[in-house]
Amino acid sequence: MRTFNEKELVSEMEPIDTEICIKVNKANIHLGKRLLIKDLTFDIKEKEIMGIIGSNGIGKTTLAKALCGLSEKNLDVSYAKNKKERVKNSYLVLQDVDAQIFLDTVENELIFCKDKNSESDLEEIRNYLKVTDLWNKKTNHPQKLSGGQKQRLAIITSFLSNRKLIVLDEPTSGLDYRSMRIMSELIIKKAEEVPIIIITHDLELLFKTCHFVLMIGDRDYKKIAVKGNENMIMDFMNKKENLFKEAGYVK
């Protein structure tokens, strides 16, 4: 559990002005027959990291699943013509990663992501294992890892995939400050290649990592730059069912 002072939380990421590479147009997000989000429209730019915040049950994870083809048959997105293409062109790392980890060793889990397994591919895998403190676990069965280690493994797996969009659902839940910083640096580096969406309650991660944030309310939504809007974002988080407590912060 991390402690922080709200006044010390300042965005480290300047807004970027690159070409738009992903468009979502008037998306309606459902949970069963219930409409959670109506007419959601937003763009994502090349190299952009966009956070998504909102209270529990508002539809953030359901939106992530829709963007990645795991729900919503019809969705107007620029990176896929249909649900099958959404699955092919995107990668979602859920909070519960057990269902996404299935091979016999940590190393094989990552090797499986690569088509050719060239020396450069293997070197990339080795580097990820070392920087995330999984090198000494590379021959272990993934299901014997701790929750945080499994989470790191699943995120590395997404980085090794060749997709047009990566979506991370609460990638730092349960991580200490050092691990959060490492994950933030990895996300920023990977975003040079592919845009990344982060669903999070972690304000430290949001302010250290994201260029923009999509704030989803009960009846509306707004996408803004993180830099310069820290107070607005913190006010939004405070009002949405005490999200600081949901995130496990001590204030």
Q: Which role does the model predict for each range below?
A:
Residues 194-199:
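Conserved H-loop
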Residues 160-164:
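A short, proline-enriched helix->beta-strand linker immediately N-terminal to the Walker B motif
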Residues 176:
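ABC-family nucleotide-binding domains
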Residues 1, 219-247:
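Conserved beta-strand-loop-alpha-helix hinge in the C-terminal portion
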Residues 166-170:
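Catalytic Walker B motif of ABC-type/P-loop ATPase nucleotide-binding domains
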Residues 53-55:
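The feature captures the beta-strand-to-loop junction immediately N-terminal to the Walker
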